[in-house]
Amino acid sequence: MAKGRFGSFYGTAAAGTDMIAEFKKKADLIHKPILATGFVVSKIAISGDPGVEFTLNGNTVVLPSTGIFETAIGMIDIESLIFKTSAKVNILYMY
């Protein structure tokens, strides 16, 4: 039995848009019966230009010099992801 599903986003994340809400809308269209118990992002990896600033669950994060940010699986429930300015990013997430 699968322990989760992956989703991805590549493109420009619009400033002020909650990307987790956007991911949920996409997942609802694809896996609605599976998501009857709720949508929780348990892992996320983001790559983009170094210095891109975003909030994750209300906490400010700045992409480091590598341009890569990643959480460990199941360490936190990711409820919101909002970029301060529009930024071209690649996001891989597990829910």
Q: What kind of feature is each model-predicted range?
A:
Residues 1-31, 84-95:
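C-terminal interaction-tip segments
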Residues 3, 7, 12, 34, ...:
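Compositionally biased, low-complexity repeat tracts
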Residues 20-53:
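Beta-rich globular "head" domains
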Residues 28-37, 61-79, 92-95:
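Beta-sandwich interaction modules
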Residues 45-48, 82-86:
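Non-cytosolic beta-sheet module surface loops
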Residues 47-62, 90-94:
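Short, surface-exposed beta-strand/strand-loop-strand elements in extracellular ectodomains
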